[in-house]
Amino acid sequence: MSNNYKAGTAINGNDYLLLNIDGNKDCDTDNGFFSGKNFFGGNQTSITHRRHHKMTTKTDRELMSHFESLDFNAIDNIIHRKYTFEKKKYQKILKTLGKWVICTLIGVVVGLVCYCLKESVDQLQSLKLTQVKKFYSTESTIFIPFLVYLGFNLCYGLISGLLVCIFGPMSSSSGLPEVKGYLNGIRISKAFNLKTVLGKLVSLIFSFSSGLVLGPEGPMFHIGAGIGSSMSQFKSKTLKFHLKSFWIFQNDSDKRDFISCGAAAGIAAAFGAPIGGVLFCLEEGSSFWSRQLTWRTFFSCLIATMTANLFLQGFTQQIHDYGVLTFGVSKSYLYTYTELIPFMIMGIIGGLLGAIFVHVNVRVNHWRKKLFANKSKLYKMIEVCVIVILSSVVCFFPALLADCRPISGISGLTPGTCDPGDDSTLILNQFNCAEGYYNPMATLTLTTLENSLQIVFSRSTNIFTAQTLLTFSIFYYVLTIITSGLYVASGIFIPMMLIGSSWGRLIGIFLSKYFTSIDPSIYALIGAASMMAGSLRMTISLVVIIVELTETTQYLLPVILSVMVGKWCGDIFNESIYEHLIELKHIPYLNSQPPNHLRKKTVAEAMSTDVKTLPEIVKVKTALTILETCPHNGFPVVMLPQLHSNSNLNDSNQLSLSLNLNNNNNNNNNNNNNNNNNNNNNNNNNNNNILCGLILRSQLSVLLRRKIFNSPEDLKNIDFISDKGYNLPIDHTEFSQELASKIPPIHELSKLITKEDLDMYIDLRPYMNFAVVSIKNYSSLSEAYQIFRQVGLRHMVVINVFNNVVGMLTRKDLC
């Protein structure tokens, strides 16, 4: 699509528009594999975003407008300054100590949850495989054992899907886009409540045991984030309790940090990788980071990993590196520098396969979303059953048709690894084979993902044929594509690792025929790293997690090399699967760098001009009317020059006149022409519109609910020049507790206001934010984006050269 098309130009019967950003435009989504391609048709808009053109429909922009931003930016007002000045040293120490205590509790709870997940999955898998083995040994036909295997998988899958239906859609999939969105500054309803966390945990237990090709890492990231949110806020809508005494932590900024700690702890406990958990959250999760957050996150990861290890090993005196998933790989073999070339080639293969996976999976999820739109959840349950049946067939019948191989033909096999008496923990599976033989395909498919990875990473040679590994890789690659996004709790980290290790070992087997010193297990490790880099596009955290999982620091260089090459190769075609899922869910996510097209725009071209301003002293009737008629969550507060020019207004008529002058002009929307910045200065002599602060909707609602009003007689005693004589009927502690509580809707607040109250006034100055971030209307939109993103703003007031309010920038104007 050409970038020269003007807005409104029709191309081939469809209205393709070059986006001219204004206050009504929302974020874009990428529906294509290559830039500029429209895969889905319809009326769409193309804009430049980082590497590619993104496609977004009007419906997408409307859906994104439903999200609200969080208030990460600290509010600087008079009551907060007074609280800070009077705050004792021991109170600061108690708050710091409280944060460390909460981080400890988060780590302990996440570790216990991880232990419950591991043990529950092992028990369910053991029950299933034991019954399959029992019927296989007693029945003359193979279909009875298959029906038992299928029955267990269907039962587990249905329970997992039903739990999502009961606990809500937030319990499905990985939940990582929602966590990333919240940590970026987006309020996502019900993402971290107790009901969602519990539903996702139990759904993950059954989906992970159902034979579906999925992993626990994404759900554990979400579960950990939910635990961090719940334990730090000391309130729950599900359990209907709220401890106001912990108000000091009940703000968006502290909640964000505790969610980061919990999310990182979830990854750390799942993989037994505390450093990897911290780096995963830093690289892939959190948008705001600090040194203090690094310490607390690492501490939470340490506690979570130790707790999980303690329970998994059974309280013995020795500490092992246990996690939900543990692996082993060769430690004696070292690579040669000539092998770096095939390692780079494997990185390219992993990048290509990862990019194809991202593209096809996004297309499948678009189709899935379109197919099930406005339909009963029964259809989603039917899809779960269909995928479970397909996965069961793929896992069972190829194993039935596979050739048996003698155990004696395996070199380097540890004695006792094929114990027929062991059920769910078999490394080599004797399925459909005589004594002394094993089934290579069943070893990969009729077991847990953990056991499959262990045997693929094993240094023992001649375990698998090239045909087995190729068939397994193709089948699981396709199954992962159609399973990711299913209506159950699921992740893709471990499936990608298993697929990559399979074709990596295949390459190692091929090269070992020509070079006797080749160890296929090392190529399995490099293949796993390449595959994950190609689909997830992580770098540092991925390398550290791989090394911590396999305890193979001697292979750090080839792992880094393959990860970097895989990421670079995948980035040529599309972005990571997580970014595409964010776009698919219409989350207005702000990346660290502004889109390229914003460099050519000014703030005036993007700002919303429908701005409602409030005076420093606002009439109750005016404030109530604005809250009832305007959905905005932030209102610029403008100065009353008539008041500031008279230090003592003892004349009540003069005071009323000064107040009414601004209240009567309050509904002026400051409409300006976005294509002509000079028009923004038409009101440069209007002294009634000078910015002096910002008041939030929630703050204004608290003032109305508490009836913190002033009569004209009360206002006469205030010195508007020196700001002395403020009436402060509520302090910072009480005000913060009110903000943390559930604020009733405006129609309920209006019932509390009497006719006499309507003629009263609200002095906003003690409560409004003096440190409001503003920007000139002629500034670059790219600079506005960076300030907005780095500071974590919810609102950015746009002013002209005379400090007059002319517009407002919000998240949706910058996407």
From Swiss-Prot:
Every CBS domain range: 607-714, 768-815
Q: Which Pfam families match?
A: CBS, Voltage_CLC
Region entry Disordered: which residue ranges?
654-685
Name under which the protein is recorded: Chloride channel protein B
GO MF, one annotated term: chloride transmembrane transporter activity
InterPro entries cross-referenced by the UniProt entry: CBS_dom, CBS_dom_sf, Cl-channel/antiporter, Cl-channel_core, ClC
Q: How does it sit in the membrane?
A: Multi-pass membrane protein
Keywords in alphabetical order:
CBS domain, Chloride, Chloride channel, Ion channel, Ion transport, Membrane, Repeat, Transmembrane, Transmembrane helix, Transport, Voltage-gated channel
Q: Which family does it belong to?
A: Belongs to the chloride channel (TC 2.A.49) family.
Alphabetized Gene3D superfamilies for the sequence: CBS-domain, Clc chloride channel
Q: Which chain regions cross the lipid bilayer?
A: 97-117, 142-162, 201-221, 262-282, 297-317, 340-360, 381-401, 474-494, 506-526
Q: What spans does the record annotate as topological domain Cytoplasmic, numbered to this chain?
A: 1-96
The role this protein plays is: Voltage-gated chloride channel. Chloride channels may have several functions including the regulation of cell volume, membrane potential stabilization and signal transduction.
- Main localization of the protein? membrane
Instruction: List the subcellular locations.
Output: Membrane
Q: Which GO terms describe its cellular component?
A: chloride channel complex; intracellular membrane-bounded organelle
